[in-house]
Amino acid sequence: MIVIDTSAVLAVVLKEAEGSAFLTAMLAGNDCLLGAANLLETRMVLHARDPANIPDMDLLLKRLRVRIEPVTESQSDLAFAAFRKFGKGMRHPAGLNFGDCFAYALAKDLGCPLLFKGNDFIHTDITPAI
């Protein structure tokens, strides 16, 4: 079981260089989870870049049987703790944004590795999926 960050979904949908590696990890993950807050974040980014990509994302998530996880109160607490420790403006090299904090919280709450792109989460205590 793995948690997927917005950045990984975007890399696949937008056919970025890392996209194929992320797709392989999602296929191998058997049970992939995406937080509802990160689903919204992904749709917002895609809508801003090119709304025509949103159906592709929806189809990808459906074909991979990605489970959308609601945000619980305890995950909200974990996300706030992540912000205080790793968030933008906290003078930490991770500089997690709002969506990052929720992906971090879901992964921590469920004890799952996180599939992500970029150099933000590597500065946290999260377990990377790849």
Language-model segments: residues:
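Short, well-structured N-terminal submotif of metal-dependent ribonuclease cores
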Residues: M1-L34, L46-L59
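Active-site neighborhoods of divalent-metal-dependent phosphate/nucleic-acid chemistry enzymes
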Residues: I68-P113
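General small-molecule cofactor/ligand-binding pocket signal
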Residues: L33, R67-E69, A129
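Acidic, PIN/NYN-like endoribonuclease modules and their adjacent C-terminal/linker elements
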Residues: Y104-I130
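A generic structural signal for short hydrophobic patches within well-formed alpha-helices
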Residues: V9-L10, L39, F121
